[in-house]
C-alpha cells in the first residue's frame, strides 16, 4: 500500500457544505448592521442637537432656527454627521423647536425630536411622542 496524504473529495465536499450552512445562519444576523449604524448616527446627532439648543437657549433665551459650522449671530454652531440632512423647525422664541434628520442609508425614513409643549412650527416629527427624546421608526 502506498501512504497517500491529502483530503478526499468527500471530505472537501463536507467542509464546503458545513461552511455554506454556517454562512446561511450568519448572514441574516449581519444584514442590517449598516442600517443600525446609520440609525445610531442619526439619534446621536439629534441628542447632540438637543444639548446644543439648550446651550443656545441658556445664552440667548430663544431657541435657534438655523445652524451652521461657523459662528454667526442668531445661528446655532452645529454640524451633523456625514450624509445626514438636518432640518430645524420652530419659532425663534422660547416656546420650543422640532427637528427632523435623515440619511439616504436609512430606509425607514427620518428621525425626529421636539422640545416645548407650545411648539408653533409646522414640522413636529410625528414619530416623536415624548418631549426631548429622539425617535426613529
Features from the language model and the residues they span:
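N-terminal single-pass transmembrane signal-anchor helix
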Residues: 1-34
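Compositionally biased non-globular segments, especially hydrophobic aliphatic-rich helices
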Residues: 11, 40-43, 129-132
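Conserved catalytic core of two-component sensor histidine kinases
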Residues: 16, 43, 50
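Alpha-helix termini
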Residues: 19, 33-36, 58, 74
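Aliphatic-rich helix starts adjacent to a transmembrane/signal segment
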Residues: 29-46
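Periplasmic/extracellular, small/polar-rich flexible segments of pilin-like filament-forming proteins
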Residues: 51-137
